[in-house]
């Protein structure tokens, strides 16, 4: 989403060089709107080189704290722009791959003998499960059984995250290799994480599961968005601050009932993929 914000920033500050400090430098590589990229925490002499005694505009903000985002009135991208007094005109995420990156991705995926389906079940980089965002393991495993005959399923995940029996793992320390695989995949079954944003950047319609409905704030109309349906169990919201469900998904506030039926959800997902 940040690439969309930078695109809007460049339209406002056309005579400025944009320097990005990010934990994910690979997302920004070759972006024509960006002058320099620095990895967060690796910024030697940054203040002296770019800020001290210079006419520099510093933009550092958290869109998740914007009033209209909290109140579910605007998408995160728009909130981010408005928060920094930048006009939002529907800018969308962007990724810029070289032709060599595309060729390597295509070559690595072409020999599986089946169309490629990318599966992402967990977000973040840790092993903790978030009921707010992540796909239930039981749902993912059942879907894989039904889809693996037609598709070669590649599971996008970190080493510490749960695997699914019989499903190959797609991971690389170079996030751009994963992003390139997104472009050359045939179908995608995702959650709200970086692959759904990359799919939007490529215009690749995907199926995205939402345990909690945050489509208006974090999703895209391009995708087939499937929201879980359930009768919530009463839980106290004592630990919520500015939102009714933080991304961590604290266990003692999970409203999902026991043995929530996944049959109808699984069928709907399969229908969107086929």
Could you tell me what each predicted segment is?
Residues 1-274:
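Catalytic machinery of carbohydrate-active enzymes
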């Amino acid at each position: 989403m940040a690439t969309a914000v930078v695109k809007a920033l460049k339209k406002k500050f056309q005579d400025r060089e944009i320097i990005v400090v990010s934990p994910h430098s690979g997302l920004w590589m070759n972006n024509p709107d960006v002058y320099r990229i620095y990895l967060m925490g690796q910024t030697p002499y940054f203040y002296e080189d770019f800020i001290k005694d210079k006419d520099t505009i510093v933009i550092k903000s958290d869109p998740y704290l914007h009033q209209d985002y909290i109140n579910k009135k605007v998408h995160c991208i728009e909130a981010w722009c408005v928060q920094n007094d930048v006009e939002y005109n529907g800018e969308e995420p962007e990724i810029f791959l070289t032709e060599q990156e595309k060729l390597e991705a295509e070559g690595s995926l072409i020999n599986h003998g089946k169309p490629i389906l990318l599966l992402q079940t967990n977000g973040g980089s840790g092993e903790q499960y978030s009921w707010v965002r992540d796909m239930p393991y039981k749902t993912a495993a059942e879907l894989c059984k039904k889809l693996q005959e037609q598709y070669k399923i590649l599971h996008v995940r970190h080493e510490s995250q749960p695997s699914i029996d019989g499903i190959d793992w797609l991971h690389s320390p170079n996030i751009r290799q994963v992003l390139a695989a997104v472009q050359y995949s045939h179908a995608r079954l995702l959650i709200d994480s970086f692959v759904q944003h990359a799919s939007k950047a490529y215009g690749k319609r995907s199926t995205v599961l939402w345990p909690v409905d945050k489509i208006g704030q974090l999703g895209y109309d391009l995708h087939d968005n499937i929201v879980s349906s359930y009768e919530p169990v009463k839980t106290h919201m004592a630990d919520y601050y500015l939102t009714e469900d933080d991304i961590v998904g604290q266990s003692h506030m999970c409203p999902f009932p026991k043995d929530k039926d996944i049959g109808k959800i699984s069928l709907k997902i399969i229908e969107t993929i086929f």
